[in-house]
């Protein structure tokens, strides 16, 4: 037994009982709690909303979020908003800080203006042809705007938002209802198990040393017992990973990406209007997709997605982002702007391939960590929200009941249909950039009936490939310093 485990076992912990305990406050949990509150407002006398732990009182619902503030996230997002608008049919984007309707959407293929990216011979030939035909095709600022894009990529009629500000807006509405308590700065360390049932969660200990042992100012994390634990803590959340370790992961749950972004205040004379949406590919590496979204008040989200299939990384994601914003197409709009904040986020790229066990006795998983992201359309916020709305109150929260309610609704939804169509949309990228684009086009245009299928390397295979590429890129005398963990 480890010292850390032994120490944890002798700590005297307080216990609190609630009806519903939620882990993580993102779009999925926001969707779940909003649906719950709306149903309670419509019929507060419904016996389903009476607390089992405090008879005569409404449901005791607590949500724990590890971030210091509900608006902590800096991610900009563009979403069709189908599920969000279904929840808020009279939604006015002006009510949400930094939100605006999509007004203009463009897709650009970016040429390499400095010649530093790793491009195949075939792609270099294509670039040369574009440059030669530039005056005819309208190539400008080392970028070619696609004259046509398939419908599955369009977000027209959707919303440009800040996830942090959207979460804050939703959270404020929930807190004002009186039914829900949301506690930021309260990380959850582990789920509580009784056999194969989840009986609640344990809050993280405060005031511990690097080994997790009590130090000055120690405060033991409370055990929160709940009839249902709703896990919406994102793609690599602490509780989601613990459930994976307990119940197992999907066979092809292997792909992750890193999103890196800046929030920039554009100069006063900017030509970019609020609601402008740009999607890009081709630079700083062909496999890296980029974006630029313009919010109200001249605020702009700009960033890149560094995918898991990049087996030969030569720069950090942050360095890639710095190169990206200096591309001529973007730099002319950004160079006199002011950096307001920056951040990064992990992305679950496995999509349907990475779907874990969605529910069991006493628990349900919603959101990105439940495999809801559509990797064909590159969308996940609206899908996460809808998975939350599909988890409606149904007691007792047994595995059978959850499968007959939550999972049944989810399987019959447009989220499931989209995820299934996208299941192999990006598999082709493991064979190269051009096969990847062909695979995406096939999947998108045929509704997933056709796609470039194949072997998806395991995480260890991808790590070894990246390690070998790193060794090959450094001098022989330094190669010994690069260790494979």
Provide a role label for each language-model segment:
Residues 54-58, 371, 375-377, 390-433:
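Active-site-proximal substrate-binding core of FAD-dependent oxidoreductases
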Residues 136-167, 172, 305-307:
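Helix-loop-beta segment of a Rossmann-like dinucleotide-binding subdomain
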Residues 423-485:
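C-terminal auxiliary extensions adjacent to catalytic cores
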Residues 35-38, 52-57, 161-169, 173-330:
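Predominantly flavin-linked oxidoreductase catalytic cores and closely associated redox partners
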Residues 310-387, 395-405, 409:
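FAD/FMN-dependent oxidoreductases across multiple families
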Residues 35-39, 43-46, 54-135, 413, ...:
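N-terminal FAD cofactor-binding segment of flavoenzymes
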Residues 25-27, 66, 163:
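Glycine-rich Rossmann-fold phosphate-binding loop(s) that bind the pyrophosphate
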Residues 10-28, 62:
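Beta1/beta-strand and adjacent pyrophosphate-binding region of the FAD-binding site
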């Amino acid at each position: 037994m480890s010292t850390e485990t032994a120490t944890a076992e002798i700590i005297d912990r307080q216990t609190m009982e609630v009806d519903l305990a939620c882990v993580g406050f993102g779009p999925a949990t926001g969707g779940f709690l909003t649906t719950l509150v709306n149903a309670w407002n419509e019929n507060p006398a419904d016996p389903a909303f009476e607390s089992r732990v405090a008879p005569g009182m409404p449901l005791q619902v607590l949500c724990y979020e590890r971030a210091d503030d509900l608006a902590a996230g800096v991610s900009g997002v563009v979403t069709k908003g189908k599920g969000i608008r279904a929840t808020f049919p009279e939604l006015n984007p002006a009510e949400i800080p930094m939100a605006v309707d999509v007004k203009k959407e463009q897709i650009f293929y970016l040429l390499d203006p400095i010649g530093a990216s790793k491009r195949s011979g075939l792609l270099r030939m294509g670039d040369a042809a574009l440059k030669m035909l530039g005056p005819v095709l309208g190539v400008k600022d080392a970028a070619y705007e696609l004259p046509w894009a398939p419908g599955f990529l369009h977000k027209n009629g959707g919303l440009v938002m800040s996830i942090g500000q959207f979460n804050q807006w939703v959270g404020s509405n929930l807190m004002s209802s009186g039914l829900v308590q949301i506690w930021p700065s309260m990380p959850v360390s582990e789920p509580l198990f009784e056999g194969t049932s989840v009986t609640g969660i344990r809050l993280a200990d405060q005031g511990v040393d690097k080994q997790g042992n009590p130090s000055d100012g120690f405060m033991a994390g409370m055990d929160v017992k709940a009839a249902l634990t709703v896990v919406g803590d994102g793609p690599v959340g602490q509780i989601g990973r613990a459930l994976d370790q307990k119940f197992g992961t999907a066979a092809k749950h292997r792909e992750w990406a890193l999103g890196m972004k800046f929030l920039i205040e554009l100069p006063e004379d900017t030509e970019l209007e609020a609601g402008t949406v740009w999607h890009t590919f081709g630079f700083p590496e062909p496999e890296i997709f980029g974006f630029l979204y313009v919010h109200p008040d001249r605020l702009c989200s700009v960033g890149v997605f560094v995918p898991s299939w990049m087996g030969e990384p030569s720069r950090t994601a942050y360095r890639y982002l710095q190169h990206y914003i200096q591309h001529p197409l973007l730099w002319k709009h950004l160079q006199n702007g002011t950096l307001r904040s920056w951040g990064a986020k992990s992305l679950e790229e496995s999509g349907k391939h990475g779907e874990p066990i969605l529910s069991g006795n006493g628990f349900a998983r919603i959101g990105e960590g439940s495999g809801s992201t559509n990797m064909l359309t590159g969308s996940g916020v609206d899908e996460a929200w809808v998975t939350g709305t599909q988890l409606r109150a149904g007691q007792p929260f047994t595995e059978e009941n959850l499968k007959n309610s939550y999972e049944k609704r989810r399987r019959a939804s447009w989220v499931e249909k989209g995820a299934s169509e996208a299941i192999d949309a990006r598999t082709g990228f493991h064979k190269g950039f051009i096969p990847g684009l062909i695979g995406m086009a096939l999947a998108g245009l045929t509704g997933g009936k056709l796609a470039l299928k194949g072997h998806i390397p395991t995480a260890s295979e991808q790590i070894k490939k990246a390690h070998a590429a790193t060794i090959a890129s450094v001098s022989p005398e330094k190669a010994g310093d690069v260790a494979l963990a």
